[in-house]
Amino acid sequence: MPTLQSGPVSLHYQTRGAGPPLLLLAPGGLRASRAETWARAPWNPIEALSDRHFVVAMDQRNTGTSFAPITSEDGWASYAADQLAVMDDLGIEQFGVVGMCIGGAFILELVTEAPERINAAVLMQPVGQVANRDEFRAIFDEWRSDIGADHPEASERDWEGCWTNLFGSDNLLWSVPDARLPTIETPMLVLQGDDVYHPKEASQQLAAAAPKATLIEQWKDPADQPAARAAVDRFLATYAS
């Protein structure tokens, strides 16, 4: 697995296939957004798309084998900078993005802060805020407990600053203000979520607000997967080729 080293930050990623490039942003929240997590997802884009795309799957900072110091300035922009740095390391200027769970929040940060880099985005059950901040706090605290021993540099202020920057807002989709959703011009395919961390309201309101977004409501059950995968294939062939 290649490693991008930038000062104290090390980012590990893997590549497979050939064709138009796609960056894959894995599910699993802060604790598990790493390349290998895709193997446990209802649909694994590494396997499904690498026959016709050059796919890049990365371990986000402080998951898997990637590392970065914890600071009070950490937030969605920190992750976006990492993701763009990986694509820069590969010499890729423009690319599509496929993300699941927290990957949806990562994508929305990318398409608002670097829209010229992203030609298409698939968001599978994006995380959202609908009366569930306590549940996200519990996930954050578990992540901190898991990695805290590896971060003697981090003070309580650093951890709380990181929490606030990520999950302290009232944004429906966490990473971007609701008012910015109608300004997103990137073509997006949204596969609806349906649980406490991925509320369907978040998917529905994103698809309604963003002018070039399309919603797929049913996709996870085995009976629905062939049609949903075909829709993803058509979408990527149209916009990420």
Go through the PLM ranges and name each one.
Residues 6-67:
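Conserved HGGG/HGGXW glycine-rich cap/lid loop of the alpha/beta-hydrolase fold
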Residues 183-184, 190-192:
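Short beta-strand/loop motif that positions the catalytic acidic residue
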Residues 213-241:
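Catalytic active-site module of serine/aspartate enzymes centered on a nucleophile-bearing elbow/loop
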Residues 93-129:
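Conserved hydrolase catalytic core segment
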Residues 59-63, 127, 219-221:
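Short beta-to-alpha linker loops that shape the active-site pocket of alpha/beta-hydrolase fold enzymes
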Residues 196-202:
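Conserved alpha/beta-hydrolase "acid-adjacent" motif
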Residues 78-95:
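Conserved acidic catalytic loop of the alpha/beta-hydrolase fold
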Residues 152-179, 195:
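Hydrophobic, aromatic-rich cap/lid helix
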